[in-house]
């Protein structure tokens, strides 16, 4: 990783230099952030690092630290490492693979940073604590023009970032295997989640997003995170959407299983998996993401016809918008330091935004695919009352096989999701590549 990071920081130095020159700035100060206190409490929420800090300094536990960059000299990290007996004192990672790319200053008191900040009015501040920035003399605080430039750069990953996301596949896949086994052993959602965390060597505090561990109809809740503590004696289906992080970079993987491998629902899962690989094989640099989402909606329409859920032609099902009730989310999203990574709608460094079309309000990416973009491919098929009820009260209701839908509602839904990186010749499936290395893939 050392060589890849050297190339990564070299590229970012050039980006910073361009940002400073175009915005007439002499330097950039980035604060990593601090844990927030709960209201009227002395307990904090888990610390979540400023992604712009993590972009330059791949150490996501670096709380209350600072970076200074001028685009020319080696960046300086001001690492906060106080003496403490209440908590485990932070240890500066001065022997890490990235350490040689920085000048180091160790701070034992957070107030010390003030003496290092020279001429703050000629610099910009990026961070959450705007009051802190003002108290230190900054007047250019999170300027949108600077953020836009950073966000757009973040949407095109370096080889270091791609490797980190690839490495994050392994822990997640090990967790998925353990969760699958726990489901087929009849464990509860709570126990399945524990199995995932143990196998992936994570805790609920450092997973990239709240694990979605859903049995039966809970799969119809897209972001279900409640967890039943008691086993379900009539388990029919299991959906798990869970990832891991390496150096702050996330994986985001989803699988669905049928309790009865010979059921029609199991056949639907298999078909959705085939659609996933099929659409990944079609991904091409320069083509807009919306076109692939539209293709997926058309395939959902085909499934609704093929499995006799809707008694219209696939073309009619798509044109009438019926498929949207069964696939309400987007095909996927950019992936990186944030699970829903920056600049999914941003079309250029200036910040021009292209919102999703009205018919697909949940689409998270309206970009043309570009080389070294990392995205999720997230296909879904659900039985959600909130979306089906309007159809039941519409003129289209007579074309829908409500008896069969009622039979399938207890399954909740299907989601399957892999992580891919765009290359000049097409998409590279990072999840499948890791599955093959772990000898988990049968595709």
Curated annotation (Swiss-Prot):
Keywords: Dipeptidase, Hydrolase, Manganese, Metal-binding, Metalloprotease, Protease. Signal peptide: none annotated. Mn(2+) 1 binds at residues 252, 333, 378, 417. The keyword Phosphoprotein does not apply. GO terms for molecular function: aminopeptidase activity; metal ion binding; metalloexopeptidase activity; phosphoric triester hydrolase activity; proline dipeptidase activity. One of its GO terms (cellular component) is cytosol. Its cofactor is Mn(2+). One of its GO terms (biological process) is proteolysis. SUPFAM superfamilies: Creatinase/aminopeptidase (SSF55920). It catalyses: Xaa-L-Pro dipeptide + H2O = an L-alpha-amino acid + L-proline. It is an enzyme of class 3 (hydrolase). Mn(2+) 2 binds at residues 241, 252, 417. InterPro entries: Creatin/AminoP/Spt16_N, Creatinase/aminopeptidase-like, PepQ_N, Pept_M24, Peptidase_M24B_aminopep-P_CS, X-Pro_dipept-like, X_Pro_dipept. Binds 2 manganese ions per subunit. Pfam families: PepQ_N, Peptidase_M24. Its EC number is 3.4.13.9. Splits dipeptides with a prolyl residue in the C-terminal position. Belongs to the peptidase M24B family. Bacterial-type prolidase subfamily. This is Xaa-Pro dipeptidase. It comes from Actinobacillus pleuropneumoniae serotype 7 (strain AP76).
């Amino acid at each position: 990783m050392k060589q890849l990071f050297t190339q990564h920081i070299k590229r970012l130095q050039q980006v910073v230099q361009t940002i400073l020159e175009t915005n007439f700035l002499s330097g950039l100060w980035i604060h990593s952030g601090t844990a927030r206190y709960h209201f009227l409490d002395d307990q904090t929420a888990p610390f979540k690092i400023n992604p712009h800090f993590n972009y330059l300094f791949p150490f996501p536990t670096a709380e209350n630290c600072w970076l200074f960059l001028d685009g020319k000299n080696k960046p300086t990290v001001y690492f906060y490492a106080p003496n403490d007996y209440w908590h485990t004192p932070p240890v500066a990672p001065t022997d890490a693979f990235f350490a040689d790319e920085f000048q180091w200053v160790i701070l034992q008191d957070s107030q010390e940073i003030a003496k290092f900040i020279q001429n703050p009015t000629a610099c910009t501040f990026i961070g959450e604590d705007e009051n802190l920035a003002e108290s230190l003399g900054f007047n250019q605080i999170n300027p949108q023009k600077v953020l836009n430039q950073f966000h757009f750069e973040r949407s095109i990953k370096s080889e270091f970032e791609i490797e980190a996301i690839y490495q994050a596949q392994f822990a997640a896949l090990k967790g998925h295997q353990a969760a699958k086994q726990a489901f087929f052993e009849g464990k509860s959602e709570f126990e399945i989640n524990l199995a995932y965390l143990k196998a992936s060597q994570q805790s609920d505090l450092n997973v990239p997003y709240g694990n979605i561990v859903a049995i039966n109809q809970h799969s119809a809740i897209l972001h279900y995170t409640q967890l039943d503590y008691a086993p379900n004696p009539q388990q029919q289906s299991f959906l798990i959407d869970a990832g891991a992080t390496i150096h702050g970079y996330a994986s985001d993987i989803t699988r669905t299983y049928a309790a009865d491998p010979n059921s029609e629902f199991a056949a639907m899962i298999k078909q959705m998996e085939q659609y996933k690989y099929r659409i990944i094989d079609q991904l091409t640099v320069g083509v807009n993401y919306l076109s692939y989402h539209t293709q997926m909606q058309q395939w959902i329409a085909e499934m609704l016809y093929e499995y006799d859920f809707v008694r219209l032609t696939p073309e009619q099902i798509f044109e009438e918008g019926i498929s949207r009730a069964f696939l309400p989310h987007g095909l996927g999203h950019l992936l990186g330091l944030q699970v829903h990574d920056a600049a999914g709608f941003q079309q250029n460094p200036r910040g021009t935004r292209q919102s999703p079309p009205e018919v697909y309000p949940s689409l998270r990416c309206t970009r043309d695919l570009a080389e070294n973009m990392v995205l999720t491919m997230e296909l879904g098929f659900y039985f959600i009352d909130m979306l089906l009820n309007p159809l039941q009260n519409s003129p289209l209701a007579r074309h829908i096989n409500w008896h069969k839908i009622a039979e399938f509602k207890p399954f909740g839904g299907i989601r399957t999701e892999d992580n891919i990186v765009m290359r000049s010749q097409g998409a590279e499936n990072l999840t499948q590549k890791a599955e093959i290395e772990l000898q988990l893939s049968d595709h």
